[in-house]
Amino acid sequence: MIEAAMLWNEPNNKSHWDPALDPDWQRFAEHVVRAGDAIHAINPAVTRVLGGMSPIDPHWLGKMEGHGALDAVDVVAVHGFPLDWNLWPLSAWPDKIAEITAVTDKPVWVTEVGVSSFGAEEVQVFGLERTASLLKGVAPRVFWYSLFDLPMSWGAETRHREAEGSSYYRHFYLGLIREDGTPKPALETYAQHAADIGLMQWFHFHDPRLDEAVAWMKRLGTRRIRTGLSWADSFRPNAVDWFDRQMEALADFDVTVTFCFTPEHLGVAPHHTSPARDPQQFADFCAWMIDRYAPAGATSTGIAAPETPPVPPRVPELTPLDFNRDERLAAERSAA
């Protein structure tokens, strides 16, 4: 069951939204306002979440408030990885949330928090236990990132790769389960908190791990999951069949679904981090998904897929199961 719709992922991170194309985030705010209003019109019971900011930045949130975006959401979300990338200590989590509540009275959800096992798996165990003690009772929703390690061959969704240096490889060790399917020590630690802390697991297009993930989450006692439905992926052949399968598999959980990734042919620039030329097209996609998977009544009202210009012959960019890593790195360098 979908309980919440999250509008974009880390919009103040250039890996997910291009500030060169929208330096004041005015366009992003318009995406949020239109999508938030569209979702509310379909089902007012769905909680609308402003995409998890990373870094946690009250000044950016103030900018969103000035653009009117906070009027179209019910919750503000934050992401943090203080033991891996952030320049603040793990113990500062309550302070970081307080920085946001000083700007808005809306609830603050932590929709991604994690600790990699890159250096040592014992560090992940400590980090999970300490994070749980800091955030339980402070944030109404907390989602641990993630259940599975990201396969090395898929590459990480980042435009900071060269700046990250060896820290780039931390992206591939954030799961509670190794790439080979074996559990890490932190999995047992997570199980002790599964009733209160959800999991964030993005399922890529036709992700072969979906059924395994569902089995693990039920075994662990996980109640909530955050995942995503990619706007860009919606233009792939038979995309709706995959979306249906994914949402049916997750029907027994309380789902926060993230809508993001601009289709290349609809962006100001041909990249998934680009603002859409017409933000209403993003809103139409969100409305279509909510009507299909979380209608206000017992059944969908039958909103059809949004009408958009035909997709060019080129396959959409987000193909993590088969992309060429050298090509991606070259693209990152040219866009830097």
Question: Residue ranges of each PLM-predicted region?
Answer:
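Catalytic domains of carbohydrate-active enzymes, especially glycoside hydrolases
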Residues: 209-232, 254-256
